Design a protein with these regions (language model features):
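C-terminal output helix
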Residues: 88, 106-116
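Receiver (REC) domain active-site loop signature in two-component systems and cognate sites
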Residues: 57
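Two-component/phosphorelay signaling modules centered on CheY-like receiver
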Residues: 12-31
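Active-site beta3 strand of CheY-like receiver
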Residues: 46-52
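Acidic catalytic/metal-coordinating carboxylates
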Residues: 35-38, 61-64
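Short, conserved "switch-loop" micro-motifs in signal-transduction and mechanochemical regulators
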Residues: 84-85
Length: 122
């Protein structure tokens, strides 16, 4: 069965970039959310195997959404990403249960390595 991946970013072009990278490499069950609140709702609906989520978003930021998702499912696989590669953000995400952290701008190889490490190959 194909692994489901939820892509969360308020910037449509960032979601598209990750989606294109993953779909070209065999990941086909890709879903999108536009902010943290949307991510929490879609997480409940879809039950994704992995969430790749931006930190800085309107309505509910990625760290709050991470906490809400982990409260629903303590074993949820969430990878945080942000242009802010600051240590405090990374540590906050890890303390809140993130499996990994990717810094923007993305390198496709880094995204694929992170996804395959967590989910295995498509």
């Amino acid at each position: 069965m194909a692994k489901k991946i939820l892509l969360v970013d308020d910037a449509a072009f960032m979601r598209k970039m990750i989606k294109d990278t993953l779909s070209k490499n065999g990941y086909t069950e890709l879903f999108e959310a536009v902010d943290g609140a949307d991510a929490v709702e879609k997480f409940s609906e879809i039950g994704p195997d992995l969430v790749i989520m931006d930190i800085t978003m309107p309505n509910m930021d990625g760290l709050e959404a991470l906490k809400a998702i982990r409260a629903k499912d303590s074993s949820a696989n969430v990878v945080m990403c942000s242009a802010m590669g600051q240590e405090s953000m990374v540590m906050g995400a890890v303390r809140s249960g993130a499996k990994d952290f990717i810094v923007k701008p993305f390198k496709p190889d880094r995204v694929l390595k992170t996804v395959s490490t967590i989910l295995g190959n498509p």
